[in-house]
Amino acid sequence: MENISDLWNKALAEIEKKISKPSFETWLKSTTAHSLKGDILIITVPNEFTKDWLESRYTRLIEQTLYDITGEELKIKCTIPNHQTTEEFDLKPTSKPRKHDDEQTEFPQSMLNPKYTFDTFVIGSGNRFAHAASLAVAEAPAKAYNPLFIYGGVGLGKTHLMHAIGHYVLEHNPSAKVVYLSSEKFTNEFINAIRDNRPDDFRNKYRNVDVLLIDDIQFLAGKEQTQEEFFHTFNTLHEESKQIVISSDRPPKEIPTLEDRLRSRFEWGLITDITPPDLETRIAILRKKAKAEGFDIPNEVMLYIANQIDSNIRELEGALIRVVAYSSLINKEINADLAAEALKDIIPSSKPKVITIQDIQRVVGEHFNVKLEDFKAKKRTKSVAFPRQIAMYLSRELTDCSLPKIGEEFGGRDHTTVIHAHEKISALIQTDVQLQKQLKEIMEKLK
């Protein structure tokens, strides 16, 4: 085995990809490899609180990561400098270190995270459809949607849903062969099988399962041989009515250098996306996390965190954990001020303001003395129609809203009306100095 410091650094690099930045920096960044005794890797941590937290919440992730890197079943223990020496540990190996055989066809349920179930998944507007589709697949594998393709940004719940499907299937059919793995692990195992001249063992392993859950499929891009292998694996499973669930950070058509025949197969079933959670969902996520971990968090702190962290669930939960850890370490009660202090390193001092269509209507209405309801009315008088066109133009320029959504906010107007307004104002700006001045004033008020 390689030098344990190099091994631990590799493990940290992989773990950093899988958890939120605040969680990584709070619990793992300051850790180092101490020693290796038998099949137990001893990690040095800064204090007792970190030791308890790592051992209770990250053991499974760390040990799985070490296995992915080494192929050996290593256990971890934590030690605190000048607090406990390695000799004081009970270091009897829990099992003899051994390499996993790639041809192994039994897939331990430990590959599934026990915390990722449908019961622990918080449903919101951004994930409702993906949740419903995942539940339908779990209830009737290969009969509802096959394949199910879930895409969305990092930390939004794709992996949670995949694990939840696996748990549900096993709960209702304990003898089912359910496999969860990343496309990177699929690639590495395939390469090892080719190297060791055991391609048939690899094929038998993944073509004889009931449910295949494969995460981050976008990493197959550019890997021609692996794509070829996965293509045939996909075909075999699909023809035998076995369920396939795939996740990605983007839809199939946007994955570069993905073979067309794979892309088309990904589109055979149902494609659903997950978008970032809205404020209400973020608060619900924090409440559920706090309850699960036994944290007593005031509502004002929940609201503060939810308002500050709007990127993804992983960052959101990581921020909550950071606040709790900070409170424990300095022995102070959790409140909004403490939360602000704990999160000052990960929250920008001045977040850019998110401008909404309602903001635009309000400011444009004030500038031109137009009532808000007039923007949605059928009035076509110039005193109303022109400000409405300006508001539509700004909505197109300053928000991420679609044309139909903008039209809906202006009294249910057709998207072609929005296009016409945008084109008209865009043309006028080129020559109308007065309009340029008005738009500048409006935008300054908005920002």
From Swiss-Prot:
Domain III, AAA+ region as annotated region, ranges: 111-327
A Pfam family per the record: Bac_DnaA_C
Signal peptide: none
Subunit and interaction comment: Oligomerizes as a right-handed, spiral filament on DNA at oriC.
UniProt note: domains: Domain I is involved in oligomerization and binding regulators, domain II is flexibile and of varying length in different bacteria, domain III forms the AAA+ region, while domain IV binds dsDNA.
UniProt function note: Plays an essential role in the initiation and regulation of chromosomal replication. ATP-DnaA binds to the origin of replication (oriC) to initiate formation of the DNA replication initiation complex once per cell cycle. Binds the DnaA box (a 9 base pair repeat at the origin) and separates the double-stranded (ds)DNA. Forms a right-handed helical filament on oriC DNA; dsDNA binds to the exterior of the filament while single-stranded (ss)DNA is stabiized in the filament's interior.
Stored PANTHER family: CHROMOSOMAL REPLICATION INITIATOR PROTEIN DNAA
Family indicated by similarity: Belongs to the DnaA family.
Protein name, as recorded: Chromosomal replication initiator protein DnaA
Native source organism of the sequence: Anoxybacillus flavithermus (strain DSM 21510 / WK1)
Lineage: Bacteria, Bacillati, Bacillota, Bacilli, Bacillales
